Amino acid sequence: LHLTIADTGWGKAIWGKLYGQMIAGANIFVYDHEKFTPADILGKIQDYHITSLCPPPTIYRFLIKEDISKYDLSSLEYCTTAGEALNYSVYETFKKITGIRLMEGFGQTETALTLGTFPWMDPKPGSMGVPNPQYDIDLLTHDGRSAEDGEQGQIVIRTDRGKPLGLFKEYYRAPDLTEDAWHDGVYYTGD
């Protein structure tokens, strides 16, 4: 039973809360709360025997500050996170408390998961993982060349050989914005 903590109106809900899980045949627990409290979420995990959980790192930071020992989280089998950088101490604390490794991912409203720590991988805290095989990912430096190991750059998706499944078509009624982000066979994520 999968729980993603994301407002259903948010882009994350499309692939991380509804469609991705439906395609995989998973059971989905949809819970939209007006105000987040760690005790509320931990209670839902316990009472409904949630097995798979995906909130952003900020939620994990709040969960580990709560007295988790008051809750039976033994149903949890798999936990992922996305939306911001995961702090190493949050990763380690959550793992120590639950025994579960947090698997990170990166995607945008414009894309599905583009980088991730996939189930067959050992997570490396601080790393978003590896490119999703459905995307031709590159890291471009400010001068437009592919970054070398250790260099910083912008995550881009090459589309010169075709548009991958999951990549948006265009920004609604904003052709200039679309052209700024996606031109010459490359989609620039801005990240």
Language-model-detected regions and their locations in the chain:
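Short Gly/Pro-enriched turn/cap motifs at secondary-structure boundaries
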Residues: G126-N132, S146, A181-G185
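Conserved AMP-binding/adenylation subdomain of ANL enzymes
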Residues: L1-T51, E66
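Conserved beta-loop-beta connector loops within the AMP-binding
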Residues: D138-R158
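Gly/Ser/Thr-rich phosphate-binding loop
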Residues: L18-Y19, I23-A26, I50-P55, I64-K124, ...
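Conserved ATP-binding/catalytic segment of the ANL
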Residues: V156-D191
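Beta->alpha turn/N-cap motifs
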Residues: P56-P57, R161
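Active-site glycine-centered loops adjacent to acidic/histidine catalytic or metal-binding residues
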Residues: D7, G83, G107, G129, ...
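Active-site glycine/GP-rich loop and adjacent strand/helix microenvironment
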Residues: T117, G129, E148-E151, K169-E170
